Design a protein with these regions (language model features):
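Short beta-strand->loop micro-motif that forms the acidic, two-metal-ion catalytic signature
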Residues: 48-52
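Catalytic core of pol beta-like nucleotidyltransferases
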Residues: 1-30, 38-44, 55-109
Length: 109
């Protein structure tokens, strides 16, 4: 079996997280991969950083997001780090360095 290049593999895992979240929530979610995987300078030990845009955030959605990311990452032997947000939060906090960085280097999944 041919090995996937690191970024391709990370995107495939991010898409799996997105699909499982969308299915569980019953509506589409937006996922943006950022960090070393998105920049293409990830190492073998690098995690996969995902900004997950949800319709709303509460304790249940945070737990569900954490569970899905953990399961997908565990099965693949990768750590998947997630940051939940909403579209309104992204607009409101757009001037913060974190969101500027995600906008600059992020890859929509």
């Amino acid at each position: 079996m041919r090995k996937l290049r690191p970024r391709k593999r990370a995107l495939k895992l991010a898409a799996k997280v997105k699909d499982q979240l969308s299915e569980t929530l019953g509506q589409p979610v937006k996922v943006i991969m950022y960090g070393s995987q998105a920049r293409g300078d990830a190492t073998k030990e690098s995690d996969i950083d995902l900004l997950v845009v949800l319709p709303s955030i509460n304790t249940n959605t945070r737990k569900m997001l954490s569970d899905v990311a953990w399961e997908v990452g565990f099965d693949a032997g990768k750590v998947i780090s997630t940051v939940p947000t909403t579209a309104d939060e992204m607009k409101y906090y757009a001037i913060l360095p974190f969101y500027k960085n995600v906008k600059r280097e992020g890859i929509a999944v």
